[in-house]
Amino acid sequence: MKIFCYGTLQESNVQLDLVGRVVDGPITYVSGYVVLRDYVDPEDGIAYPRVVPAENGCVYGRVLDFTDAEVKVLDAYETEMYVLEDIQVASGETVKIYMPS
């Protein structure tokens, strides 16, 4: 499954920890969104990124291809805070993205 990653899932150390391999993919962007880091988890104190609509916004990231088994691991990592939705990247391709739930 191709997923547009705009946060920690782009980091090789996170990928290695989660799926046991480094996943690389093309840099691209989605228009009409911005990344906010305005939610701080009260348990760990970390500010997590989230993508929200913004008329003139643009979010850069990478399209990474994960297996179905890897996506299950990513879903657990992202918790109920995020859900997979369809989004169109700059090339016109429709891929998945973790959006705030």
Where are these regions (language model features)?
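Glycine-aromatic micro-motifs
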Residues: 1-101
